[in-house]
Regions:
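A short, low-complexity linker immediately N-terminal to eukaryotic Hanks-type protein kinase catalytic domains
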Residues: 7-29
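Protein kinase glycine-rich loop
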Residues: 29-40
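Conserved N-lobe motifs of Hanks-type protein kinase catalytic domains
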Residues: 35, 83-86
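Glycine-rich ATP phosphate-binding loop
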Residues: 41-64
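Regulatory alphaC helix of protein kinase catalytic domains
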Residues: 73-78
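Short beta-strand micro-motifs within the conserved protein kinase catalytic domain, predominantly
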Residues: 90-101, 109-110
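Structural motif in protein kinase domains
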Residues: 108-129
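Protein kinase catalytic-loop region centered on the HRD/HxD motif
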Residues: 153-162
């Protein structure tokens, strides 16, 4: 992550049609997560971005973005573009199409924190989509404390970024 963040440039504009093609039309088979912002899909290559060995995670908004939502998203993109912290993935690309706003990050092949903590059938399916034959072992207590410390450090950084 640190090497990616150090080499990060301002996020590139990525056309929506390119994201649609790369994710097979935002196919369920490419979905690796879902959260408050929307769904996350994996793709291996995007012509608008330099190739990265880990692939890409494309976060999509659950609904179309209105004028106010677009302004808020542009503000968030400016903040994320300026961020450089060892515990934050760099924002590589953006698509601010009113029909579907998307943020592009490097793909974390280790899975989400939620999936590493709660080994549900859905988590096992997502691990398989990331290339695992079986789920990785649960996080140790020491690893959980490191995650907690690193997340707190990243949140503090974001909230004090000016």
């Amino acid at each position: 992550v640190a090497a990616l963040a150090a080499a990060a440039a301002p996020p590139a504009a990525v056309p929506l049609d390119e994201l649609i093609t790369a994710t097979d039309g935002f196919a369920e088979a490419r979905k690796v997560g879902e959260g408050g912002f929307g769904r996350v899909y994996r793709c291996d290559a995007l012509p608008s971005l330099p190739r990265v060995a880990c692939g890409f995670a494309v976060k999509t908004a659950l609904v179309g973005v209105g004028a106010q939502g677009l302004a808020e998203l542009q503000s968030e993109v400016r903040t994320l573009s300026a961020a450089c912290h060892r515990s934050l993935l760099p924002l590589l690309g953006v698509c601010l199409a009113p029909a579907r706003a998307c943020l592009v990050y490097p793909l974390c092949r280790g899975g989400s924190l939620e999936d590493r903590l709660y080994r549900t059938p859905a988590a096992l399916q997502r691990f398989r989509m990331l290339g695992f034959d079986t789920a990785p072992p649960p996080l140790s207590s020491a690893a959980r404390l490191r995650v907690l410390r690193d997340a707190a450090s990243a949140l503090h950084y974001l909230h004090t970024l000016s």
